[in-house]
Structures are given as structure tokens and as C-alpha cells.
Amino acid sequence: MSTTAVKENEPVLAAPKPEDLAAVLIAKNRPQRPSALSTSVTFGWRAMLKIKHVPEQLFDVTAFPIMMTLMFTYLFGGALSGSPTEYLQFLLPGIMASSILMITMYTGISVNTDIEKGVFDRFRTLPIWRPSAMVGYLLGDMLRYLIASVVILGVGLIMGFRPGGGVGGVAAAILLLLAFSFAFSWIWTMFGLLLRSEKSVMGVSMMVLFPLTFLSNIYVDPKTMPGWLQAFVDVNPVTHVVAAVRSMMSGDWDGGEITWVLIAGGVILAIFGTLTMRLYNRK
């Protein structure tokens, strides 16, 4: 005897008629396909919710920049510039740029993690703009970059940083840095798709970012370096980014450096954005 009891008065659902199914399938009034902007914003919101549910991932965005600012200002400020306060005026824009560029690698790590979980298999079946998933990651990470900028600036102001460019110069410098970081993050999305594990993505990212950030004009003036090292520092893209941000915050806008950063960001976006989407479509 079956263990499932059947109620005598329970209504029996009739099977749908073939003509009714056909009418639904061929109906012309179908839901409108979401726009590229709406899907990108949706995926960006998804990335922000990850931060909400795992707030400890903001440790690198907040604690690390504060530690670097305090350590370099008070340990080396007197020896390098005569006083910690004077050195802070030179150091803080560089610390802000290096901290944000360093945390761009987490975009690639997030992409690689979702691939390993199989989330992208579902994304690729959706009738949406294909790059929106990648763009969403970057939009969500823009919140990280903004938080890092505000934290570093706040600590700097408490320590005695006084930007000559005022509020407008600081805001413009942060916007330029965020725009370049958005383009720069596409490098790590490519590695997130290309490499097999998140540890590999982190290893490659650190191998690239550490030389770029430390062999630059962030901590000292390149004029004090040996000639062979100065030659590398002068062509280092981080050097140009820091120089542009530093000039805007000080009020002495360097049009050449700002233009260089904008053009370099566009080139990086065009190259690595294209490579990322090709890998994504073949993954």
C-alpha cells in the first residue's frame, strides 16, 4: 500500500492544451531585454553585497594604508625631508595611489573564485550583455577604492596633511585615480580567467605590483636615485600616476602627466578589456 495518501476531494490539475502552450511561446509581447547599464549596475550591486556580508575583507583597504602612512611618515620623514609633517605632504598622494593600485588585484581573485564555484556557468546562460558580469566586478570594487581614498585622506588630515589644491584638487585627483584603477583592474580580470587558482592570481599580481610600486616616486624623489634605477622609475606607469595625483592635490596641475594617465588608462582598457572578454567567451 502506498504511503502517500490521496485526498478524495483534492482537485486534479488539467494538462495545458497544446494550442495554449504554442500561443505563449510565439507571443510577441516578451519581456524587454535588460540594458547593458542596468545589468552592469546589478552585478556591481552583487559585488557590493559581498562586502556587506564579509566586511573583514576591507582590512587591506583600511588598516594597511594607515599602517604604511604612519610608519613611513614617522620613521623616515625626519631623515628624508627634515620633518614628518613636511614629508607627509610629499608621501600621502603616493601612498593613496599605491594602496588603491595594490587592491585592484582583488578583482581578479574574485573572478577566479566565482569561476571555481561555477557561478559563471549560470551567468553565461542569461540573456544579458556579456561584459556586464566583468564590469559589475569593477564597479563594485570602485567602492573599495573610494573607501581607501577617504580613509587615507582622513588619516593624513589628522596627521597634518594640507593639500594646496583644496577640496577641488583633492576630489579631481581621487577621480583620476579611480578612473585609472578601473582600467588597471582589467589586467587582473584577465589573469583571473587565465590562471587556475586564486593563489596563482595573487602571486602573479604581487610579482608585478611590488616592483612597480616600490621602484617609483612614491617614497623618494627619483633625482636621488642612481642613473640606471632612475631610468626605470621614469618609465614606470605608477610614477606618472603618482606625479599626476600629487600635482592635482598640491594645486600645481601637471597637464602632461594627467594626459599621460588618461591615455594610458584608455590603452590598458582597450587591450586588456578585449583580451578578458575573449577569454571569458571561450572559458
Feature annotation, model-predicted:
Residues 130-205, 252-279:
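Alpha-helical transmembrane segments and their short interhelical loops
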Residues 16-17, 22-64:
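Aromatic- and glycine-rich beta-strand/loop motifs that create alpha-glucan
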Residues 55, 74-84, 212:
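Short, hydrophobic transmembrane alpha-helix segments
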Residues 72-81, 159-164, 168, 195-197, ...:
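Short helix-capping/hinge motifs at transmembrane helix termini and TM-loop junctions
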